[in-house]
Amino acid sequence: MHTVTLLTREGCGSCVRVHGQLLPLCEGAGARLEVTDVDRADDPDLAAEYGDRLPVVLVDGAEHSCWEVDDDELLATLAGPDPFAGWD
């Protein structure tokens, strides 16, 4: 199962929009959706690395997109092989 991570922060209107966009896409593709607030994460480097480009979408830990999400591109990625299959 792929993991889609939405990097966000409080007060980010675009992040709310992208979250609403990701919910049905992840559900339909059978992917797990996680939301991480970069300002409250255990990793302080997240805010430094991504804070000026939010929202950022990661797929299986790799950056997929920022600001805008192309539905078809994301679905194609989620239809591909899971690099961590069998690690559970």
Which stretches of residues belong to each language-model region?
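Short, low-complexity, intrinsically disordered N-terminal peptides in bacterial proteins
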Residues: M1-T3, P24-R32, A79-D88
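Thiol/disulfide oxidoreductase modules built on the thioredoxin-like
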Residues: A47-R53
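Non-catalytic, surface beta->alpha helical segment in thiol-disulfide oxidoreductase systems
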Residues: A62-D88
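Structural motif corresponding to alpha-helix initiation and N-cap regions
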Residues: D43-P44, D71
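Thiol-based oxidoreductase modules, predominantly thioredoxin-like and allied folds used
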Residues: A31-D43
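Local sequence-structure signature of Cys/Sec-based thiol-disulfide redox active-site neighborhoods
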Residues: M1-L25
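A short, hydrophobic beta-strand/beta-hairpin element that forms part of a small beta-sheet core
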Residues: L54-E63
